[in-house]
Amino acid sequence: MTFTLRLLVLCTVYSYVISQCDDNGVIYTNGDKWIRNNHFLVTCRDGNIQTLKCVTDSGHLLEVGSKSYVENGYEYMCAREVTDNLNTNTCPTFADFSDDIFKDRFAICCISRRFKGCVDANGDIVKSGFFVIGNKSLKYCRIQANQLQARIEPKGCFNGTEKDDVNDEELHIKKYAVWREGDIEYRCGDDGVHIQRCFPPELKKKAIWAGTAWIQEDGQVKTCGKIN
């Protein structure tokens, strides 16, 4: 009986431990719910972190797989990522330096079967350091010493041109920063620089949210920001 009781206690403790979730050092128990990365309502299920809903900047909850939702000129979509498997064994047997394979902006060398760098907006490979992708979104490419692990870190936005030095920190903008240039107000978001509001002279500088369209007295149709 004693042996059975100890075994039961051991199994109970073991089951409790594996049902926990570790999110960047914070431990959650099975069934706990919390907001992750400011935009995801998640829960802990049997040791795995699962997304329940997406969260907008104002706190509105979106169902996974629901239609797009517009809030303050921003369009939100809550969808599960579809992952494509990639294997270095697909590289040619006699590979050369032109035989690179790519996965989610990571470049992998087929000769060494190691990470080579990250791919910027122009399709160039950055071996290490800052680089820019679409909408002036600033990233940092970090390749581990053994080149078997790589990470792309979000660093905000880059308020410069292709001729400017991407390492110039005076041109780096922190995430969620808002600034105005002329009649346009910009915001550095998750996907780079976007127009947030317009202050058109024809509307007496009244603030207009991005995604808004209006007809002027002369019949011209104007929009604030790009509407896809």
UniProtKB/Swiss-Prot annotation:
Q: Which residues are glycosylated?
A: N135, N159
Keywords per UniProt: Basement membrane, Developmental protein, Extracellular matrix, Glycoprotein, Secreted, Signal
Is Repressor a UniProt keyword of this protein?
no
Q: State the GO CC annotations.
A: basement membrane; extracellular region
- What stretches pass through the bilayer? none
Q: Please list which residues make up the signal peptide.
A: 1-19
Q: Where in the cell is it found?
A: Secreted, Extracellular space, Extracellular matrix, Basement membrane
Q: In which tissues is it expressed?
A: Expressed in body wall muscle.
Q: What does this protein do?
A: Required for the directional control of distal tip cell migration during gonadogenesis, probably by recruiting fibulin fbl-1 to the gonad basement membrane.
State what protein this is by name. Abnormal cell migration protein 18
